[in-house]
């Protein structure tokens, strides 16, 4: 297939077909992998679901708060993620993050 000779619409249609083929291929391979794992687990006398529950997930590390609301010290922020409304309000009123540091 000479893709250089294809029009833009033909190239887009081809890309769409390739994208679908990739998704289908990956799904098929995942199902095959699952079937193999299930067979191995059954040969050893265990249901795969039971074995999968043994997979350890790392506990999320808690991050210490860096900033506190001067008006309500129980409201804190680690400095990660979206700024809480009280931080945005403090910054809008002219305070800096250093003013909110714990």
Curated annotation (Swiss-Prot):
List the Pfam families hit by this protein, alphabetically. Histone_HNS
A GO term from the CC aspect: protein-DNA complex
- Where is it mainly found? cytoplasm
Q: In the record, what terms sit under GO molecular function?
A: bent DNA binding; DNA-binding transcription repressor activity; minor groove of adenine-thymine-rich DNA binding; transcription cis-regulatory region binding
Key words, A-Z: Activator, Cytoplasm, DNA-binding, Transcription, Transcription regulation
What happens biologically when this protein's gene is inactivated, per the record?
Grows normally under saturating light (6000 lux), in low light (80 lux) grows poorly, decreased induction of puf and puh but not puc operons nor genes for bacteriochlorophyll biosynthesis.
Q: Per its record, what triggers expression of this gene product?
A: Expressed in light-grown cells, probably a member of the senC-regA-hvrA operon.
Could you name the domain of life of the organism this protein comes from? Bacteria
Entry's localization field: Cytoplasm, Nucleoid
DNA-binding residues: 80-85
The family line of this record is:
Belongs to the histone-like protein H-NS family.
Which PANTHER family does the record cross-reference, listed alphabetically? DNA-BINDING PROTEIN STPA (PTHR38097:SF2), PTHR38097
Q: What binding partners and quaternary form does the record give?
A: Homodimer that oligomerizes on DNA into higher-order complexes that form bridges between disparate regions of DNA compacting it.
Functionally, this protein is described as follows:
A dim-light trans-acting activator of Puf and Puh expression, that has no effect on the expression of the Puc operon. Responsible for regulating light-harvesting-I and reaction center structural gene expression differentially from that of light-harvesting-II expression in response to alterations in light. Proper light regulation of light-harvesting and reaction center polypeptide synthesis is an important physiological trait that enables cells to adapt to ever-changing environmental conditions of light intensity.
What is the name of the protein in this document? Trans-acting regulatory protein HvrA
Q: Which gene encodes it?
A: hvrA
């Amino acid at each position: 297939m000479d893709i250089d000779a294809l029009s833009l619409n033909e190239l887009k249609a081809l890309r769409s077909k390739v994208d679908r083929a990739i998704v289908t291929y990956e799904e098929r391979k995942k199902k095959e992998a699952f079937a193999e794992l299930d067979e191995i687990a059954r040969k050893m006398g265990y249901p795969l679901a039971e074995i999968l529950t043994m997979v350890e997930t790392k506990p999320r590390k808690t991050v210490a708060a860096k900033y506190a609301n001067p008006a309500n010290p129980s409201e804190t922020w680690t400095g990660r993620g979206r700024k809480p409304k009280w931080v945005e309000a403090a910054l809008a009123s002219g305070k800096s993050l250093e003013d909110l540091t714990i």
